[in-house]
Amino acid sequence: MGILNKIFGTYSERELRRVNPIVNKIEALDEKMQSLKDEDFKLKTEEFKSRLEKGEKLDDILPEAFALVREAAHRTIGLKHYREQLIGGVVLHQGRIGEMKTGEGKTLVATLPAYVNALTGEGVHIVTVNDYLAKRDRDLMAPVYEFLGLKVGVILHNLNNEERQEAYGSDITYGTNSEFGFDYLRDNMVVYKEERVQRKLNFSIVDEVDSILIDEARTPLIISGQGEKSTEFYKVADYFTKSLIAEKDFTIDEKANSAMLTDEGVNKAENFFKVDNYADAENMEIQHHVVQALKANYVMKKDKDYMIKDGEILIVDEFTGRAMEGRRYSDGLHQAIEAKEGVRVERESKTLATITYQNYFRMYNKLSGMTGTAQTEENEFREIYGLDVIVIPTHEPIARIDNADVVYKSEKGKFKAIVDEIVERYKKGQPMLVGTVSIEKSEMLSSMLKKKGVPHQVLNAKYHEKEAEIISHAGEYGMVTIATNMAGRGTDIKLTKEAEEAGGLMIIGTERHESRRIDNQLRGRSGRQGDPGESRFFVSLEDDLMRIFGSERIQGIVDKLGLAEDEAIESKMVSSAIESAQKKVEGNNFDIRKTLLQYDDVINKQREIIYKQRSEVLEGEDLKDQIRDMIRDVAYTAVNSHISGVEEEFETELQNLVNYLEDICLPKALVKVKDISNLSDEEIKEKLLEAVENIYSNKEKEIGEEQIREIERVILLRVVDTKWMDHIDDMDHLKQGIGLRAYRQQDPVQAYQFEGSEMFEEMIYNIKVDTVRYLFHVEIEKAPEREKVAKETSTNYDEDSVKKQPIKKENRIGRNDMCPCGSGKKYKNCCGRMA
């Protein structure tokens, strides 16, 4: 490959040769654009829209449109896209990932493809990692878009429904990945189409694309409601787990991030919980709580994986070091950590709707992304998202010096050397950014520097609010900044003149991350736009990466050299061993994400079917034919499942059939066994169907056609939502235990697909049964007024937005009847409580 690259150039270089002629055309139009009057810019936008309506393609107008944006940016915000930024814009428009180094002006680059793709009127989403960046980027670039006659909006966490609809109705919408994803899920939970906020997913430009599509890929978006299980057992399991002895009662697998009981531990569990066989299926609940308590106590680390703030457990993002407010670990792990730390144990939540970022972003017609570091994950982008990575050349050559790693025998020796290095460089006024892997490590280093009298600022999850401000000062003369991993990403570090003369920004990595990309991101904070700078990583054999994944050869070499604690080695062999350990972990993580996607694809196909049908119900008012089909299916399936054809059991089967249908749609004693005992199966079906249809026709006349159609819609939507929520839970439980199928020589993914498909068919049938049951049992004096129901079922975007709001209707329903809202509860325990 190396020789071929030398002859033909890398893939990126070959692709850039194709882009260059387009960029030449854009630059050639510069003079023409300069001659335009200010008022001409909006007219040009209208002209482009008209040309597109007449059949021209976006690519036909691209050179002129890009040249127009370039001049508009120059006139409004004083910035003119340089050649490399124009290249980046073309790459993004083509639906690719542009790798652009820190400080190359990604925010400005996005204006080019955003403008061109917004001309179709179908909307463009520009995605960033947090609210601060979304608002900042919108505010910076809004003058450009507005000068061109486009409307620009931003989605922030605290917006209400109307504000969201307005923002999504804009030509270009800025927002965070989580807000876009949650809005999609909420849109598929509404009862009236007027409540939906998003339009169709057209074109998305994802900033920090590696962070969102790879680092976040394993974290599903979940809208949840309060579960009903008690939390007491988490405390019991925690008490038991704290009595265990490491290695004797349980073992820890650091590679898999899990802990397991040994045989001795199992014996202790059986004695403690007073069960005969811990592994028995009926003890699954105990196993589940013990596994989570083990993980909470012996795998999850405080101030690394999570932190405590105001008596609440907050997850710490392993890639950014940010506290993830509002996020909770699923499957009871969060509750287990709460029990471990002695804070209030919240109830386990029930999933109402969920999707992964992988599947959300794959729904866009066109997807593109920008980041400073994507090449190491090129295979994953191509395989999962169909995106290729093009490395965009920098405007100025990179002047940063990347030094070789220095390796120490112990962590203590390493940190002593880091402090010495900081003190030395501080004396000459060189600014430093020191990257740590956890809050705990950053605070330890901070206290060591305090003892040495070195003033510094600390940036980690605990000081999240000041993030952008702290990072913006990191390039000043003599400034020392300690930051967990990638905190402050998206904010430029600009050097002062004195800092530049002192050698530029020095990056010190206190540990190698398991991903080369994260290390490259840290390095990339220095040397922006040709600035001077330097970087070096300090590594010890006690670091997690070296301990868990490093080879024994390195340990052997260090032992032979007989290194003292504070002596270091710089060796190419050690550096390449570190890199191969990282590649091993990256490959392992990619495989995990790929397997998770195979599982998620099963429920994703089911989600698409449910949401598509749900959308059709929202759009079309008249469900008469669908409801009639459901009534027929329920009646026919009941006959088929109750009558076996065995003559001796015929009378009993008929009685069971009548009882079953009386629970769903037949009034008591309307059909007697003797009336149908002499009929064939087909005749029984016809007779029962005729009786049921007559009852429903009478109900329709009694309530009125318009009102019954409205009730059908609301009840069907509620039943679909309730059954879908239960199905998500069932699929999750299936997935938890499916890995064990490998012991039976079964492919777990295939088993999940097959059984998941059967469960889905069963859910579809249960939707029909419950819809028919509620429609036959509901008696309404007054039809639900659209506005009233819309108000009562609207999605709120405050902290309680995940709670399911029951529909209130003026019904004549018995207190012990099933509630017609579709919750599956009795009326007295559901909407009846509100009456």
UniProtKB/Swiss-Prot annotation:
This is Protein translocase subunit SecA. Its EC number is 7.4.2.8. Zn(2+) binds at residues 819, 821, 830-831. Monomer and homodimer. Part of the essential Sec protein translocation apparatus which comprises SecA, SecYEG and auxiliary proteins SecDF. Other proteins may also be involved. Gene3D superfamilies: Helical scaffold and wing domains of SecA, P-loop containing nucleotide triphosphate hydrolases, SecA, preprotein cross-linking domain. GO terms for molecular function: ATP binding; metal ion binding; protein-exporting ATPase activity. Disulfide bonds: none annotated. It is an enzyme of class 7 (translocase). Belongs to the SecA family. It comes from the Bacteria. Keywords: ATP-binding, Cell membrane, Cytoplasm, Membrane, Metal-binding, Nucleotide-binding, Protein transport, Translocase, Translocation, Transport, Zinc. GO terms for cellular component: cell envelope Sec protein transport complex; cytosol; plasma membrane. May bind 1 zinc ion per subunit.
